[in-house]
Amino acid sequence: MLKTNQKNVHAFEIEKQEPEAVMEFLEKNHALLQYFLIIFKYDIEPEVKAILRKHQLLFLETNRALNGRHIKTMSLKEETDHPKPNHSKTEPKTTIYERHIRSGEEIYSANHLIFLGNIHNGAKIISEGCVSVYGVCEGAIVCFGECLILKEVKSAQIVFQNQILSLKEVERLLVNKNIKIITKNDDILDIKEVL
């Protein structure tokens, strides 16, 4: 009998556009794209393929339409030309989730987020504010805030301030169930354990 595994995949579909815009997008966002399949709906230019291989990104070239939920996003030009918001004017609010975040659920927020329940495998959290998880974290977290607080971590899919946590850093989080606070000084991640 043939042994197979079924997987759910999150993907970005990229339609035909200028290679320079695609290359700029890939260079700027390669850390976050590590967790996605990138689907090109055209034949990819060699210089774009070189960047995909350089960052070891998973990609597919196809003209075939794919089924699935679609999330409307900005064009690459709008994304790369968009001015950065001035965060100094308004302090983000805090949103508290007392429930578990299920597999397949995605939360995108400009607020600080506090999770009292578990974040299941296949769930994804992206926040411009600080993130605190006091349950078990098995899902993906992308935090752009000043700190990331985690208790019991069972995931290697953690990005803090545009930096993917290395295997060594993730291993420090897996050691025990104590609360860990992650901050960043310049380009150095600091992981402190609260006893």
Curated annotation (Swiss-Prot):
The keyword Cell division applies. Interacts with MinD and FtsZ. It comes from Helicobacter pylori (strain G27). Cell division inhibitor that blocks the formation of polar Z ring septums. Rapidly oscillates between the poles of the cell to destabilize FtsZ filaments that have formed before they mature into polar Z rings. Prevents FtsZ polymerization. InterPro entries: CAP/MinC_C, MinC, MinC_C_sf, Septum_form_inhib_MinC_C. The keyword rRNA-binding does not apply. Belongs to the MinC family. It comes from the Bacteria. This is Probable septum site-determining protein MinC. Keywords: Cell cycle, Cell division, Septation. The lineage of its organism: Bacteria, Pseudomonadati, Campylobacterota, Epsilonproteobacteria, Campylobacterales.
